[in-house]
Every structure is written in structure tokens, then in C-alpha cells.
Amino acid sequence: MGFVKVVKNKAYFKRYQVKFRRRREGKTDYYARKRLVIQDKNKYNTPKYRMIVRVTNRDIICQIAYARIEGDMIVCAAYAHELPKYGVKVGLTNYAAAYCTGLLLARRLLNRFGMXKIYGGQVEV
């Protein structure tokens, strides 16, 4: 066998640059995130909104967000644990609860932007 040089010496560790924290934790794929949040350059500083849905064991979280340099800004949010206030008592993590939570988010977003009168939704049952 020939001579094997030690690669991880003091100079190696002195110049080593760690990855971003969320990359080290395995939470963020920055390549996919870049493709998701970058707006077209001909749209001139217009935010690119996206809907984020997280399903936990006991809740469903829906959010509308857009990316800024300082971090993502949440415009509006709705949670499945708020649904009992509107009459949905059980099953807060199933398909129907996800639909209701998204509907609640949409109504809140329309109210926030003042478009609730334009898009009234279903009024007759």
C-alpha cells in the first residue's frame, strides 16, 4: 500500500463552510424552493403568492404566503381547529375538513382584500 495523505487536517476544518441550517436539518430543499418562489422578471416586484397546506396528526393548517428576502410573509391563515365554531364538530383531519379549511381561508382572503362582495359564493342551499 502506498502513502495515504490525511485529508481532514487543521487546514481543512479551518476553511470548511457549513451548509444552511435548514439544509442541515433536512427541512428545506433550496433548489426546489428557488423554482417555487422566484417570480418572472417581467412582472416587476409583484409577489408570487402560494398556498401552503400542512396536515398534522390533530390539525390542518392552510396559509397564503409570499417570499421576501427577510423571510416568507404570511398573508392569511386558517386552521382546522377553528371549524367547530362553524358547525364541524368531529374529524378535523379528514378530506372534508381539509376542504372546509381551504374554504375558510379563501373567505378570509377575500375579506382581507375587500373582494367579499364581488365573490359572494353560494348563497342558496
Curated annotation (Swiss-Prot):
Its main location: cytoplasm. It comes from the Eukaryota. The modification N-acetylglycine is found at G2. One of its GO terms (biological process) is translation. GO terms for cellular component: cytoplasm; nucleolus; ribonucleoprotein complex; ribosome. InterPro entries: Rbsml_uL18_euk (IPR005485). The modification N6-acetyllysine is found at K5, K48. This is Large ribosomal subunit protein uL18. It comes from Sus scrofa (Pig). The gene is RPL5.
